[in-house]
Structure formats: C-alpha cells, structure tokens
Amino acid sequence: KMIVVMSSGYAFREGEQPVFYPGDFESELIHNIIPYIENNFRVRKGRDYRAMAGLSLGSAQTTDIVAKNMKLFSAAGVFSGVAIHEMERICDSKETLDVVFMSCGCYEDQIRTGMKQIEQKFENAGKYCISKVYEGYHEWHVWRKSLYDFVPLLFRKKGVEADDIPREKTARITRQRLRMETMEEQILMFDPVYRQIRFETDEAGRPAGKYPDIP
C-alpha cells in the first residue's frame, strides 16, 4: 500500500514577487508536507519509504529537491525533463537511490539527448537507473505510462530491469490521432499560458492565481 501526496508546487512566501517558477517548494515539502503526513497518517518513516516524482516542471523540482536531500528520499521519478546538473549530483552522491527512473516522449529530442547523457554517467559510475521512451510528445499520453511503470518499481528489489516492468495492454492509437490529441493542441496543456493566468498572492501571501476572465 502507498499514499500519494499531490501538493501544489507553488510555494510563494509573503511579500515574494509571484513569478512562474514556484518559489521555495523545497522548504514547504520538507518542513510542512512530510511532517504533516507522518503525523496524521499511518505511514512508515524514513527515506526507505519515501519517493518523489514529477512531470515537466515537476520533474525539475524532483531532481533539485532529491539531489539536495538524498537522506530523505530513496527513489526519484523524472518524467519529461532532465536537469543535467541535478541528475549528476544524484549520481555523484555517496547516498544511492533504490530507483532512478527517467522517461520522455519519443518526439522530445532534447530531453532524450539529456537522458542518454545521464544514463552513460550512471553506467560509468557503476550505478543503476531506468530510462524509458514512449510514443508521444510532452503530454499526458507519456506521463500516464511513466507513472504506471514507475510505481511498481518502488515495491521491487534493486536491479530490476526496465523490460521486466509489466505493461498494461492498451489499444494502439494512430499517429494522426496522437498528433491531433497532443501536438496540435499543445498550447492547451499549458493552460496558464493559454488563458494568460496571473500568478499572484493574497493578503496572507498564499498563491492566488487568477484568470483574466474570472473575477
């Protein structure tokens, strides 16, 4: 069994300029979210029972936070985003993660190149990581499969091969439909950009994003 915590990655402080990058989420996670979960739910404590994963911008947060706090996490899932410097820090750390999982869509060329670079570094260091590429772009077709493959690894022994991951049988979609549902509507995925959302804080300094057409 596991508890999945999906918190807001935007952690602006009172008086902080509300920009797109999500403030001090690391502090929010370590000093507020983790203690709250441990104090209010029946969970096992310690890094062996804690993992972190994220997609797109969330993958950057994951690699940054895990790299700085290797004693707090035993696994990292990086979906569609490779922060080279942070991944190198994870590889070079004296602490070793039980699971390092990277993934992206087959059309995300820049991310695929970064993943290959990190794979090679882990291999040269004698450390283990899993890298998966799925049909798709920077979108949910890829991230759903990434999560589906990542989660079982948290309950398996070290050294499991990527090909050993059981795959869910899904109907293969045509390339035309894939493009229609992803690339052609890519801008819709970035709803804040598409709708011109304004990232602001309320009087208490809490995130208060507003759409221009919503009072």
Region spans (language model):
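Short, intrinsically disordered, charge-balanced linker/junction segments flanking boundaries
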Residues: Y211-I214
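Non-catalytic cap/lid and distal C-terminal segments of serine-dependent acyl enzymes
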Residues: K1-F199, G205
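Exposed regions on extracellular, virion, or secretory-pathway luminal proteins
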Residues: P207-G209
